[in-house]
UniProtKB/Swiss-Prot annotation:
Molecular function terms from GO: rRNA (cytosine-N4-)-methyltransferase activity
GO annotations of cellular component type: cytoplasm
Keywords on record: Cytoplasm, Methyltransferase, rRNA processing, S-adenosyl-L-methionine, Transferase
Primary enzyme class: transferase
Family: Belongs to the methyltransferase superfamily. RsmH family.
Chain residues that bind S-adenosyl-L-methionine: 31-33, 49, 76, 97, 104
Matching NCBIfam families: 16S rRNA (cytosine(1402)-N(4))-methyltransferase RsmH
Chief location: cytoplasm
Localization of this protein: Cytoplasm
Organism: Ehrlichia ruminantium (strain Welgevonden)
Name of this chain's protein: Ribosomal RNA small subunit methyltransferase H
Domain of life: Bacteria
Gene (name only): rsmH
Length: 301
């Protein structure tokens, strides 16, 4: 399963890769952004992904672009540390594509999908993080669970869902995505006016909690800002309002010259696009996953 990169043309237009440049693809996935960057200029790409399953895509890209793509299995919050270890101090651009990939959703064994039965896992990396979705649904208190589902999923029935999960686990441990989805659907019915599955928001919330995604995003952008050359760019494509809000706030802090995550960056930044860039109708038609994508970008002065 290949993950179709979203807003690819728009990302490339803004990044504008140059010969001799050094770029970071902070969310490598199946390598769509990395391939496009490498095709655009005679440059180097340092690619990061915490999902060890993405290594096979790196191998293919490495054969196509020998000595120009460098791959690291790690969290993108470690960008600075990763690059320091290979004596790279500054880069010309960092690209983030936030959230779960099509490959992860399609693989039932990863436990991300409510439409495919599999073990309750949801970890982006099975080697880097220990807490999984099964632990969340079977051990977290009802109050904390309801708060997570509400805050990270925007689910108005969060209390009802949390109560149903706790009632179910008191009888039998919840082990699969199918069991969890059935519990949620038993207390929340599908809206007549909306095609969204009742389990969608809860699964999103649990995934964000398991992977500490919002905390990772804050750290990742702050580290990226710290390693940019003058004229360097950070581009973030996000898929839901929580992520986009974090990007918007951090970019504003950077433009206002405020410190981010205890990093006092000194140099100024400016927004590249004042308004969010969204996919065209044509892209949404050919790749429905793109419909909620938002792109924000910032330039180091």
């Amino acid at each position: 399963m290949y993950h179709t990169p979203v807003l690819l043309k728009e990302m490339l237009d803004i990044l504008s890769p140059q010969n001799g440049g050094i770029y970071v693809d902070a969310t490598f996935g199946s390598g769509g952004y990395s391939r496009a960057i490498l095709n655009s200029a005679d440059c180097q790409v340092y690619a990061i992904d915490q999902d060890e399953y993405t290594y096979t895509f790196y191998e293919k890209l490495s054969n196509d672009f020998p000595n120009r793509i460098h791959f690291f299995i790690n969290k993108f919050s470690k960008i600075q540390q990763i690059l320091n270890n290979v004596q790279i101090k500054k880069v010309d651009g960092v690209v983030f594509d936030i959230g779960v990939s099509s490959m992860q959703l399609e693989d039932a064994s990863r436990g991300f999908s409510f439409s495919k039965n599999g073990p309750l896992d949801m970890r982006m990396s099975t080697s880097l993080s220990g807490v999984d979705a099964r632990m969340f649904v079977n051990t977290v208190s009802e109050v904390e669970m309801a708060n997570v589902i509400y805050q990270y999923g925007g689910e108005k029935y969060s209390r009802k869902i949390a109560r149903a999960i706790v009632n179910a686990r008191n009888k039998n441990m919840i082990n699969t995505t199918g069991e969890l989805a059935s519990i949620i659907r038993s207390v929340v019915s599908r809206s007549k006016n909306h095609s969204i599955d009742p389990a969608t928001r809860t699964f999103q919330a649990i995934r964000i909690w398991v992977n500490k995604e919002l905390e990772e995003l804050e750290k990742g952008i702050a580290c990226a800002a710290n390693i940019l050359n003058q004229g360097g760019k950070i581009i973030v494509i996000s898929f839901h309002s929580l992520e986009d809000r974090i990007v918007k706030v951090i970019f504003k802090l950077l433009c206002d010259g405020k410190s981010v995550n205890l990093l006092n960056l000194g140099l100024g930044f400016q927004l590249i696009n004042k308004k969010i860039i969204r996919p065209t109708a044509e892209e949404i038609h050919s790749n429905p996953r793109a419909r909620s994508a938002k792109l924000r970008a910032i330039l180091k002065l």
